[in-house]
Amino acid sequence: MDKPVKPAXVTKNIGRTGSQGQCTQVRVEFMDDNGNRTINRNVKGPVREGDILTLLEAEREARRLR
């Protein structure tokens, strides 16, 4: 139950998603990995480049926007 959280910095704002545009799709880069791994995530609420997110699940990646 006590999974470690992963800090990730928002590097790029890709666009709005969701049926009414309530989520923002962003590209995040993990701060604790040595390989500089980046994934796309959907974020609810206000977010901009340079923000730090604490991700509870680091393996899940959002589908690409069309």
Curated annotation (Swiss-Prot):
Classification via InterPro entries: NA-bd_OB-fold, Ribosomal_eS28
Keyword Endoplasmic reticulum belongs to the record: yes
Disulfides per UniProt: none
Region Disordered, residue ranges: 1-20
Tagged with keyword Cytoplasm: yes
GO biological process, one term: maturation of SSU-rRNA
Localization: Cytoplasm, Cytosol; Cytoplasm; Rough endoplasmic reticulum
One Gene Ontology term, aspect cellular component: cytoplasmic side of rough endoplasmic reticulum membrane
GO molecular function, one term: structural constituent of ribosome
Key words, A-Z: Cytoplasm, Endoplasmic reticulum, Ribonucleoprotein, Ribosomal protein
Subunit structure: Component of the 40S small ribosomal subunit.
Family indicated by similarity: Belongs to the eukaryotic ribosomal protein eS28 family.
Protein name according to UniProt: Small ribosomal subunit protein eS28
Provenance organism: Ostertagia ostertagi
Lineage: Eukaryota, Metazoa, Ecdysozoa, Nematoda, Chromadorea
